[in-house]
A protein has these predicted regions:
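A residue-level marker of the well-folded mature domains of exported/periplasmic proteins
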Residues: 2-4, 8, 14, 18-222
Length: 222
């Protein structure tokens, strides 16, 4: 359900962008019951030049990590379904968490005159250059699930509240164990901002208990 809501946020944001609407500095949270709710943050003062030079082409590129992970497959499917409902052709491709491949996919989207790019990126810092190229070409980028570490390049960065979600999970673990015992922590992709945020929030709760971490290993989201 979260993926559908996220895709809906993206679709609504793209409609506003294609219509030439300006952006604001406000944040919008999904009204659903999930504690890890979707949060849409509109970048400060997105310039008119990314609002959008290729709108008439009605082509959206959706760029995500490998769809071997069902989550990213669902993101692509939802984006495609929502985009097509609005009359856009949606091309879904994967960067496989390779920043170089991601950059090449951005180049292709730019050369084909994409109206917009939706991206679940290959690294908060490593993705800045690719997004900058789209920005310079007048193509708006909507970042989903994972942010990049530079403001003003994306029209929106639509992400889950990973801090809140991880804290809730840690609190549930403490309740189930009475705050005692050993545990192992499986991390996501360690270069990913979401991984760091979740781990920090998890430890903010567990480090106040008598629980002991005996192992920590990256699962790279697989």
């Amino acid at each position: 359900m979260f993926k559908k809501v996220l895709a809906g946020f993206v679709a609504a944001a793209m409609v506003a962008t294609m219509a030439g609407c300006g952006s604001s500095n406000s944040s919008t949270k999904d009204s659903g019951s999930d504690k890890a709710a979707a949060e849409a943050t509109t970048e400060a003062a997105a310039p008119a030049k990314v609002l959008n030079t290729n709108a008439a082409n009605k082509l959206i590129y959706c760029i995500t990590p490998s769809t071997s992970n069902p989550y990213f497959g669902t993101v692509q499917t939802a984006c495609k379904e929502e985009g097509e409902k609005l009359g856009y052709k949606v091309k879904c491709v994967s960067h496989d968490d390779d920043a170089t491949k991601q950059s090449e996919l951005f180049d292709t989207a730019i050369s084909e005159g994409a109206s917009a790019i939706v991206c679940d990126n290959a690294g908060a810092d490593a993705s800045i250059e690719a997004v900058q190229k789209a920005y310079d070409a007048g193509i708006p980028t909507f970042m989903v699930d994972r942010e990049i570490n530079k403001e003003g390049l994306c029209v929106s960065q639509i992400v889950a509240n990973n801090d809140q979600g991880a804290q809730a999970a840690a609190e549930a673990l403490v309740e189930a164990t009475g705050g005692k015992g050993d545990y192992a922590e499986l991390l996501g992709l360690e270069s990913d901002t979401n991984c760091q945020v979740r781990s920090n929030a998890f430890h903010r709760v567990l480090d106040q208990t008598d629980m002991k971490m005996v192992a920590q290993q990256s699962a790279n989201w697989d």
